[in-house]
């Protein structure tokens, strides 16, 4: 009997390992390259991650595409950051989401540069693709979308906030 219980316990281990980490709707996330911790909205309705930036400019370095930008967040200094450009993200506009576009025409899409950032939430450090755009008209300078939430093997408690505490990476 003890052998059967032991084997049954081993079979159950993968189910326990697959349990998602539970985060609140808002979390503190540290951006390693920048050395800042920002409040972030964990948004399952958005696909990608987005960071509030200004003075966004694409340029060439040694034959590669790069982007330079400044943070557009409260308390940010005037530091100019440079990252290798990973691609361009085409994001639905609010007009398209609301159905306020001509169905016979190509809907307008916002094009945003995408960079790789190391993000720390709780004790998890992940390389994440983040698009850059001015989010100063939003309450949270960093948005974490469904792709990153899935990569973190996470689930979101919509009624909870800051369940992971301050980042420890």
Predicted segment positions?
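Hydrophobic h-region of N-terminal signal peptides that target proteins for export
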Residues: 8-17
